[in-house]
UniProtKB/Swiss-Prot annotation:
The modification 4-aspartylphosphate is found at residue 54. It is found in: Cytoplasm. This is Sensory transduction protein LytT. Its main location: cytoplasm. It comes from Bacillus subtilis (strain 168). GO terms for molecular function: phosphorelay response regulator activity; transcription cis-regulatory region binding. GO terms for cellular component: cytosol; protein-DNA complex. GO terms for biological process: regulation of DNA-templated transcription.
Amino acid sequence: MLRVLIVDDEMLARDELAYLLKRTNDEMEINEAENIESAFDQMMDQKPDLLFLDVDLSGENGFDIAKRLKKMKHPPAIVFATAYDQYALKAFEVDALDYLTKPFDEERIQQTLKKYKKVNRDIVETEQNSHAGQHKLALSVGESIVIVDTKDIIYAGTEDGHVNVKTFDHSYTVSDTLVVIEKKLPDSDFIRVHRSFVVNTEYIKEIQPWFNSTYNLIMKDGSKIPVSRTYAKELKKLLHI
């Protein structure tokens, strides 16, 4: 059963979205929260699969919760559901699955649920392939599916509002979010070093100190990847430095 959490400080908006979700005829457990504190309490307790999140929560910012969720080992998929359309690009920069604007449309919500199922199915299939010793990654590039060896991937990152997967031979602009790509990559080889970048540790050539306890990674193809303070400690631990 799909577990859904709706986070919105307006009760009518929560009720409308819950009603439309139930009309999809999917089996799901729907819970609601009116603020970030309540949302995190429920997330720790119920571990939702899918989070519908407003941007403006009575002085609190939905993007703050999205950034905090990215640090979780198994974060829920995030769908921003808001009255504002100007934050769509920013939403995808924090790896949102989708972006809905009020008033909600039932057909549009069905599209979001289909997208979630497809992404979730791809993750499960990738994990199964990984357990079977296969290290291929299927990338959605435009209307095509491109298959690459994970060992050939130098990094995956969000650049100019798009998620790119970089190999020595090519840079693929994909439709998946960075969180989805990260979940498909083997933990033994890849590490997140920034909210916008996941790198293959085999291709790190040099680590350059930057400012304010941050770093730049020079990859073997010449790419320069930033390392934020949030992830620097984990990187140094992994590389024994």
